[in-house]
């Protein structure tokens, strides 16, 4: 059975970098997918679906539920390793509920943990506006993305806390201790 870890955090929390470094350090056992990267790759392909996705991403809004869930399910099925890390998901209560439903209807993938990389809005803003990744990294879009992230957050955290799947990592430190703590946490959860 595949073991799935979801990494959530504000824009600029470092969740994608953290997950990527963990997977790179153990590539034979861990696969990392970023919903943002999967969606941006579709946009870059120039497909009709990509154009639809771009109309949402460029404004900092959520991509429709069916598109995101299909993208993630395809990625999980294609994963070459037992352990899978997906970052940036779920981003809404609807995504969470739909994903929970999809996972409960199969027996190949087990959600082992939802790891929140916690940072203040101030640190998140500093990081996002300093990274110049693309058109979706300006102040107006940042505040919209932050609002999109924080509005459903309490309900998402409550849901996973009740399932005893929610874990917190302090994301305001340098990358090395964050990644080390996350690796340790994943190993600990897998041994339970």
Swiss-Prot record:
The compartments listed are: Cytoplasm
Q: Name one GO biological process term.
A: AMP salvage
According to the lineage, what is the superkingdom?
Bacteria
Task: Show the SUPFAM superfamilies listed in the entry.
Answer: P-loop containing nucleoside triphosphate hydrolases
Which sequence ranges form a coiled-coil region, renumbered to this chain?
A: none
What's an example of a GO molecular-function annotation for this chain? adenylate kinase activity
Entry-linked NCBIfam families:
PRK00279.2-2
* Domain notes for this protein: Consists of three domains, a large central CORE domain and two small peripheral domains, NMPbind and LID, which undergo movements during catalysis. The LID domain closes over the site of phosphoryl transfer upon ATP binding. Assembling and dissambling the active center during each catalytic cycle provides an effective means to prevent ATP hydrolysis.
The family note in this entry says:
Belongs to the adenylate kinase family.
Give the protein's recorded name.
Adenylate kinase
Recorded source organism is: Campylobacter jejuni subsp. jejuni serotype O:23/36 (strain 81-176)
């Amino acid at each position: 059975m595949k073991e799935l870890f979801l990494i959530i955090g504000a824009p600029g929390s470092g969740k994608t970098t953290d997950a990527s470094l963990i997977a790179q350090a153990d590539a034979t056992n861990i696969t990392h997918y970023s919903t943002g990267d999967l969606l941006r790759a579709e946009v870059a392909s120039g497909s009709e679906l990509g154009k639809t996705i771009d109309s949402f991403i460029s404004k900092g809004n959520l991509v429709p539920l069916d598109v995101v869930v299909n993208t993630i399910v395809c990625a999980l099925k294609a994963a070459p390793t037992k352990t899978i890390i997906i970052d940036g998901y779920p981003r809404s209560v609807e995504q969470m509920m739909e994903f929970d439903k999809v996972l409960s209807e199969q027996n190949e993938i087990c959600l082992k943990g939802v790891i929140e990389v916690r940072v203040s809005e101030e640190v998140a803003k500093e990081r996002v506006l300093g990274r110049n990744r693309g058109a979706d990294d300006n102040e107006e879009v940042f505040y919209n993305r932050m609002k999109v992230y924080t509005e459903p957050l309490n309900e998402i955290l409550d849901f996973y806390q009740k399932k005893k799947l929610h874990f917190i990592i302090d994301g305001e430190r340098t990358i090395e201790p964050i990644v080390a703590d996350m690796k340790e946490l994943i190993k600990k959860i897998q041994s339970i």
